[in-house]
Regions:
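Amphipathic alpha-helical interface segments used for oligomerization, scaffolding
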Residues: 1-172
Length: 172
């Protein structure tokens, strides 16, 4: 019953039809293993971000359709994934589909490095070794791995990169 109530609430708040709201709720609940009794956090998260950023709940939901499973696979939460989508949408004003696809690609590449650090990953058609990515990030003071050699959470790495973004130039 909670899921139905939250889905109806999402449809009303986001201006979505019931089918789209059901799909949006199902994607989030399944990908992030949210209990049915906790489904309200999906509506609350999307609504709070829509109020704070120049993005609608339906845009977040649409981008989440592309991104949710990849994000959950690298340990991201509903909240952090939604926040990344919101900031990217506000900053670029790209469509939800484009934001979802872009974030999914970035997250998937990180997941590939985490799963097989010795293998090459495809970056814009070029095969790149993990150590090149690691070296590039280390040159600006960011480590992909923690002190024990384990991969850090994706959102922690990205937040650290974001904090240094304005200091980067074409030579960095």
């Amino acid at each position: 019953m909670e899921l139905t109530t939250e889905t109806l609430k999402m449809a009303k708040i986001a201006g979505m039809d019931y089918t789209a709201a059901t799909n949006a709720m199902t994607v989030a609940v399944r990908a992030f293993n949210i209990e049915m009794s906790e489904a309200q956090q999906v509506t609350d998260t999307y609504s709070a971000l829509a109020a704070k950023f120049a993005v609608s709940s339906s845009e977040i939901a649409n981008a989440m359709e592309k991104t949710a499973s990849s994000a959950a696979n690298v340990g991201m939460s509903l909240q952090s994934t939604s926040a990344f989508i919101s900031v990217m949408t506000q900053t670029t004003r790209e469509s939800a589909q484009n934001i979802g696809s872009a974030l999914k690609s970035i997250i998937s590449r990180y997941g590939e490095m985490k799963a097989s650090p010795a293998s090459l990953i495809n970056v814009d058609g070029e095969e790149v070794a993990f150590n090149k990515v690691d070296t590039a990030l280390k040159s600006i003071g960011i480590s992909i791995k923690d002190a024990s050699g384990q991969f850090r959470d994706f959102d922690d790495v990205i937040m650290e990169l974001a904090s240094k973004w304005d200091t980067l130039d074409n030579n960095t």
